[in-house]
Swiss-Prot record:
Subcellular location: Secreted
Single GO MF descriptor: serine-type peptidase activity
Active site: H62 (charge relay system), D106 (charge relay system), S209 (charge relay system)
Organism of derivation: Homo sapiens
GO biological process entries: protein maturation; proteolysis
Parts forming coiled coils: none
Main subcellular localisation: secreted
Peptidase S1 domain sequence ranges: 22-254
Disulfide cysteine pairs (residue numbers): C47-C63, C138-C215, C180-C194, C205-C230
Cellular-component GO terms for this entry: extracellular space; secretory granule
Record has rRNA processing as a keyword: no
Protein name: Kallikrein-15
Family: Belongs to the peptidase S1 family. Kallikrein subfamily.
Amino acid sequence: MWLLLTLSFLLASTAAQDGDKLLEGDECAPHSQPWQVALYERGRFNCGASLISPHWVLSAAHCQSRFMRVRLGEHNLRKRDGPEQLRTTSRVIPHPRYEARSHRNDIMLLRLVQPARLNPQVRPAVLPTRCPHPGEACVVSGWGLVSHNEPGTAGSPRSQVSLPDTLHCANISIISDTSCDKSYPGRLTNTMVCAGAEGRGAESCEGDSGGPLVCGGILQGIVSWGDVPCDNTTKPGVYTKVCHYLEWIRETMKRN
């Protein structure tokens, strides 16, 4: 339920929880996630996404906006270090059965006007040939919300949250449907998959929406929703299960 908040709200918020960041990870090695995409709306960072072919990007349907721009090869959103590519979109195609309230079918395809130039820093993610297994090790990445607590200031106005400049990565694992259903009773469907880290919860937060969950080098999930607030929960995050949508992805790309 943490559909992406506006940037101004994120930057103005305060964190009441002791800890370094809401996404419990570290800065990714630059360009170690070459499929990572940053989506922009009117010049502002909006969501994450994944490149899946030179012409196509995959994200969450709740990230849809009217004026979308795509940035490839990014690491530090405030600096240009060479591999960045800016693209416009000719088609934005959310799943026809997307339901915002229930988060069902939270998946979207974007067709690029000009194809991506593939290189070591810009490379498509590999789509799955099977669904993920409980316990499988994964990496979630994004420019989502982080917190910075000065010593002795946790919970005070000086304990600020912000969107980082650099891409962050966190190591998490797939949670079984049975276990995840205990956290979100009656809310999960077979098109969703849960992932998190034991004792630390979701690991992803506002701003990570639409970004990749990669397991063994395979794109298995799209950051979709989770518990609120994400800095104060042990519940896992919920991801759109990419393996369930392979036919829709392929047919949509073929028709467009």
